[in-house]
């Protein structure tokens, strides 16, 4: 009793490369890591009201290979200087300007510095000693050098987003993606 297509099946099995499964797993790991970066960046961008591109370029992916099936995501969690948000411009408020000699919290007659989509009262632009331009603001309670660069804190949102999303995506997407990658590897070598 001969099984139909047995020779073809044996031929196909012998044609599957030894590194087909490691290649599929490396491909899967890279896909899952990329998805984690994308979703975490989107979440942080929504929370901090910063463009997704600015958040995404703070994370680097060292891709998994057949020999080393581990992907490493490195994230720059430092604060983001406000000057990176876009064009800075001074907007004059339409409120009644203060009279000469009157004290006001809005100095300069209510002009406010707007950078990207953020209004920063009491801020100004200055070139630092290192040649970079930054948005500066006076800091109360600081005796020496009472001005500081205006920054958006990114450490907490980035950490929480990446921790949540990496675990969730690993649970949900990894088995599915591994199945797709194995099918892809087999499809390349198997003849029907």
Where are these regions (language model features)?
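Short, Lys/Arg-rich flexible segments
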Residues: 1-192
């Amino acid at each position: 009793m001969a099984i139909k297509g047995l020779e073809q099946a044996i031929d196909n099995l012998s044609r599957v490369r030894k590194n087909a499964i490691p290649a599929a797993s490396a491909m899967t790991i890279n896909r899952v890591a990329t998805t984690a970066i994308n979703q975490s960046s989107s979440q942080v961008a929504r929370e901090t009201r910063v463009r997704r591109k600015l958040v995404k370029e703070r994370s680097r992916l060292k891709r998994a290979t057949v020999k080393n099936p581990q992907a490493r995501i490195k994230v720059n969690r430092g604060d983001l200087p406000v000057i990176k948000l876009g064009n800075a411009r001074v907007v004059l408020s339409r409120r009644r300007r203060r009279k000469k000699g009157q004290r006001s919290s809005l100095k300069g007659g209510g002009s406010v510095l707007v950078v990207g989509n953020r209004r920063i009262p009491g801020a100004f632009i200055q070139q630092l000693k290192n040649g970079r331009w930054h948005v500066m603001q006076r800091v109360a309670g600081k005796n020496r050098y009472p001005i500081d660069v205006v920054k958006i804190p990114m450490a907490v949102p980035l950490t929480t987003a990446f921790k949540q999303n990496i675990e969730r995506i690993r649970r949900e997407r990894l088995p599915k993606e591994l199945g797709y990658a194995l099918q892809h590897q087999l499809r390349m070598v198997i003849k029907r």
